[in-house]
């Protein structure tokens, strides 16, 4: 599920086209398709990652007042007590944002801003992205070969 805002961000920040990203997915659902399977708690998943997560989407999820499939699926993920990871990248954050993030964490969401992990000694932007992806997949118990581990690949005992 890709929101219209995500499509705009993709075009502005990368050389990728929406079709390129959709080609990576096993299934694609339109953001307006609120009858898609993932809008129901009976559709089983390991959880959900919203990346990047806008403040608008974050706020919709926190209130349960959802306007599209992305926010609805995240809301369902929380109500079903599944893992929900929000990669909120807004900065700086005001008190209202912080309170909303706190509310989401209390509801069971994991807040994982896509920040660079400089301990992993990134050489490229792709290295920074790989590390953020790997740490996010860790939350689901999934391995990503490109993530650098402290003590194994980097750090004083490497």
Label each residue range with its predicted role.
Residues 1-85, 91-158:
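A cross-family phosphate/adenosyl-ligand binding-site feature
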């Amino acid at each position: 599920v890709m929101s219209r805002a995500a499509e705009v961000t993709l075009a502005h920040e990368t050389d990728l086209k929406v079709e390129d990203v959709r080609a990576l997915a096993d299934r694609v659902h339109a953001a307006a398709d609120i009858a898609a399977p993932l809008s129901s708690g009976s559709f089983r998943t390991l959880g959900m990652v919203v990346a990047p997560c806008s403040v608008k989407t974050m706020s919709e999820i926190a209130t349960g007042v959802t306007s599209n499939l992305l926010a609805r699926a995240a809301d369902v993920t929380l109500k079903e007590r599944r893992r929900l990871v929000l990669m909120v990248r807004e900065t700086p954050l005001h008190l209202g944002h912080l309170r909303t993030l706190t509310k989401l964490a209390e509801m069971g969401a994991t807040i994982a801003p896509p920040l660079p992990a400089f301990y992993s000694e990134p050489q490229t932007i792709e290295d920074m992205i790989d590390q953020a992806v790997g740490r996010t997949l860790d939350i689901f118990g999934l391995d990503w070969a490109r993530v650098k581990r402290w003590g194994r690949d980097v750090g004083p005992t490497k």
